[in-house]
């Protein structure tokens, strides 16, 4: 294995959202938002990142509301308007959640642009998003292909210390830990990141050219 990329990736799962608590019917909420507890989790993560002096120089975020909210709260230090620590934000549909339930389907772009006018959603203007088809289909094989493209996306960015705000099931695809028998709509808790959990990985390229996330020795 070799690593000429010299990139560090901080994988962050979003804070607790409406579909993470309550009855199964909550999975029918379209693109749910954070709960009050989820907001508190994000505030705690903001303090943790600051106390550990995490040197983020780029942010990649899923275009779903719970991840956008998590980014705005947990990474507020890095998003400071005009501040010395302000870093670029990349909104990418590659990092949306897998699954076909309403809770895993994003809002239409016109609504997103109204809710979050300061961000660029151009990458979502692909004629597919937010529909769950083609590269975004709720399918294990397709999601594995999407995770490969997501890693290629990260590798192509000019930044070296990248925070990625994404979702529990898709994180398992990024880490190549999803098995075909797994239910991607209802992932067992023992197989997932906790809400607002973050872990540090090195983005490396193997001798065969494969991109992988390997847990960092500095974690």
Swiss-Prot record:
SUPFAM superfamilies registered for this protein in UniProt: Phosphoglycerate mutase-like
Active site feature: 14, 167
SMART domains attached to this UniProt entry: PGAM
Domain of life: Eukaryota
GO molecular function, one term: phosphatase activity
Keyword list, A-Z: Hydrolase
Stretches that traverse the bilayer: none
EC number(s) given by UniProt: 3.1.3.-
CC annotations in GO: cytoplasm; cytosol; nucleus
Similarity comment text for this entry: Belongs to the phosphoglycerate mutase family. BPG-dependent PGAM subfamily.
Protein name: Probable phosphatase SPAC5H10.03
Species of origin: Schizosaccharomyces pombe (strain 972 / ATCC 24843) (Fission yeast)
Organism lineage string: Eukaryota, Fungi, Dikarya, Ascomycota, Taphrinomycotina
